[in-house]
């Protein structure tokens, strides 16, 4: 207690923020790839989720596959949809061009705003699987409809 009182900065707020950050990181990982055993089943590991598009190659994705992924989602859910992927997948996708040699990637016009891919926001997480055989490296959907319930006493 004395340490909290003698600190030259708000140590209590700092500790609270670090604990919240650590919980946030753990929850992000579980919500992406959780196994369902003492943690939520992640959106990339859920058996009930439908795969909209299967890539032709294990380590690449094409513009046509991204377009097919967008339209695999029912139209009511596309309006607020976003892409979710890891940085390695973003790196590969940033290099994709259309038939006229124009990049599909659209950087954000304002600081703090998400980048765009084919007109949709794109967010990243280090916990999304990488592009490899059998992996699901990209999610596209309206994540406002992804409900999370924290239960006490589990």
Give the residues covered by each predicted segment.
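Structured, hydrophobic secondary-structure cores that serve as assembly/anchoring elements
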Residues: 1-154
């Amino acid at each position: 207690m004395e340490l909290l009182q003698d600190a030259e900065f708000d140590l209590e707020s700092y500790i609270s923020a670090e604990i919240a950050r650590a919980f946030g990181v753990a929850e992000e990982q579980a919500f992406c790839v959780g196994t369902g055993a003492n943690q939520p089943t992640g959106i990339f590991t859920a058996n009930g989720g439908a795969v909209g598009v299967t890539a032709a190659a294990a380590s690449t994705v094409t513009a046509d596959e991204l377009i097919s992924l967008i339209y695999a989602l029912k139209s009511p859910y596309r309006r607020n949809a976003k892409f979710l992927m890891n940085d390695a997948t973003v790196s590969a996708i940033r290099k994709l061009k259309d038939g006229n040699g124009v990049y599909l990637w659209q950087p954000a016009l304002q600081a703090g705003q998400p980048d765009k891919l084919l007109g949709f926001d794109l967010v990243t997480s280090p916990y999304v699987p990488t592009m490899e055989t059998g992996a699901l490296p990209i999610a596209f959907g309206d994540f406002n409809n992804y409900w999370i319930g924290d239960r006490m006493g589990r």
